[in-house]
């Protein structure tokens, strides 16, 4: 499925278009991190499927008016995976290719962790867990102040490290208590951190924990687009805050780094990128 033109792209069926677009996003992530010689490629590749479906099919946003009051909010709590968001914001029309090429450069719109100066970014994030609290605060403010019949959602994208932080769990208890039905969190459960597998340091059953805190809980294959769609529809109709726990594979689609902590916080080698692009047919 090697397609380099819009004409070829339009000949694809919907599933092929989705797959190709996700693979292109992964290519942008790998190239951006490699060009900066710094960053985190593995996490964006595990989170790419959910985030693509979210942005392309569910978010209420307007790239021509990034600060539109009636937009949904997205908080990337797992801020070090920001090359994923920048790549998607580029495809949505918020950013330019030069912005991606300037990833992690001083003064750019694409710093190493998200900042609200970047069009389409709703929160400064970096310290793990902080974005969970920020997203819950946004959802509470929206619920308290909304004077519109349009239900606006706050989405949090979180990873293993986020939910290991007390700030995230403390805020989550409040979200359940306040029944913030306009809050949806995706937990990218790839079970890998920079030093190894999460089982080395954490055995928490987060599905049971969030259920006990009063959340609507779903567990899905985080790479299955149909499961992602259904989980988002269910979450949007819940009368509780929702957590979607997606079992994913770090560096999904890479040539040799799937499941590997080596993919977490270092650029892929040129050979790995080349072989991965061949595998993904991009």
Regions found by a protein language model. Name each.
Residues 61-64, 114-282:
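Glycine-rich ThDP/TPP pyrophosphate-binding loop and its adjacent helix/strand module
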Residues 2-153:
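Thiamine diphosphate
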